[in-house]
Every structure is written in C-alpha cells, then in structure tokens.
C-alpha cells in the first residue's frame, strides 16, 4: 500500500501542475515537435482567447518545475510557446450546438481585464457589447497590451474582430452615457478607470482585476 501511495502515474506532469491554467504542456510540446503547430495552438487556445498576449506575459513556471530542465536536458518551453502562437493556424470554432444566452452583457472601458472578460463572455455565448473611447480594434488591443510587437498586436486585433462581439468605438464614457447603456444590459462590467468614476469610494479587487 505504501508503494502504491508513492505512484505518480495518474498524476499530472510537473510542468502541467505548475501551470496556473493547468494547460497540457506535454501534449502541446508533443505536437510542436511533430511540426503540427495548428494542433499545438489549438491546445493553447483552450486556456485563453488571446494566446499572443498570454504568451508574451507568461513567466513559464513550467520550466522551473520540469525535471528534464533540472537534468540539463529540457527545452525553453516559453520560446516554443512563442513559435506556436506566431506560426500556428488559429482554429475555426463551429457554431453548431453553440446556443446564445438570453442575458446580455455590457463592458465599459478598455484594458487587460475588460479584453479577456470579453473573450470569455464570447466563448460562453453571452451577447456582449463593449463601449470604449478607442477608435478601432487595434487601438483597443494596444490599450490592454501596448508592449506587444506591432505584428502581434495586429494579429490579436484580427482575432478580436472575428469574435461574436459588438463594439461601439469612440464613446464618451461619461456618467450619463454609461447609465443610459447600463439599462440595456443584464450584466455590467467596467474597467478600473470607469469603475472608479462610477463608485469612487470603492477599491478595486486586486485578486480579480487584471491591471
């Protein structure tokens, strides 16, 4: 019984366990090694709607916990990730069996939190409208991840544009405008900047608000 308790056969690999998103790193690397970057990217897309942004900010804790890396036989997983998101072909999601929810969501403002929230709401099929002061998709991406290379920012803007989301660009996000649009939605979310304007005495929850 003691030996059985020590068995790790059914436990996740160290790299997978170290990943905050619990991505199947081994499977992703397997397909990358085979040259199937499309399949590798599909695995990465399971954990994020914007792989280039996540990859750019990833600190790769998987590498620190990889046993092969400890022996000097590991690979730079982060660099493999970069190659996958740049050269992999994005998958096309089927609309079959994807039923739109009845409740409508509204997001006010821009930044990392509103961007990823929009991606997650779209994935869950909530009709979502984003109201922002930016003039186009690329500037909206830049507001969330201005550190991205121009080519990567452009690719993420294309990804955002292809999503089933409604955008109202160039909005004047004043209180009267926001309150008017809030009446049209069942769920309302806001960037930290807009939230401070709506409730100046409330502090942002740093546990959920990505900065």
Regions found by a protein language model. Give the residues of each.
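Beta1-alpha1 glycine-rich phosphate/pyrophosphate-binding loop at the start
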Residues: 22-34, 42, 74-75, 107-172, ...
């Amino acid at each position: 019984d003691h030996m059985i308790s020590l068995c790790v056969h059914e436990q996740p690999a160290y790299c997978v366990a170290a990943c905050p998103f619990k991505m199947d790193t081994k499977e992703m690397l397997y397909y990358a090694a085979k040259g199937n970057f499309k399949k590798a990217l599909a695995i990465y897309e399971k954990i994020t709607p914007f792989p280039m942004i996540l990859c750019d900010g990833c600190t790769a804790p998987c590498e620190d916990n990889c046993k092969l890396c400890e022996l000097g036989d590991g690979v730079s997983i982060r660099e493999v990730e970069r190659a996958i998101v740049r050269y992999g072909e994005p998958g096309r999601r089927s609309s079959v069996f994807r039923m739109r929810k009845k409740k409508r969501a509204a997001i006010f403002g821009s930044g990392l939190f509103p961007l990823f929230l929009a991606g997650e709401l779209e994935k869950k099929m909530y009709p979502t409208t984003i109201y922002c002061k930016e003039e186009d998709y690329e500037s909206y991406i830049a507001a969330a991840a201005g550190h991205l290379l121009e080519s990567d920012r452009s690719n993420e803007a294309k990804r955002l544009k292809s999503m089933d989301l409604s955008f109202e660009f160039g909005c004047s996000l004043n209180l009267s405008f926001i309150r008017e649009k809030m009446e049209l939605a069942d769920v309302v979310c806001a960037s930290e900047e807009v939230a401070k304007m709506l409730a100046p005495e409330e502090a942002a929850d740093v546990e959920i608000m990505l900065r």
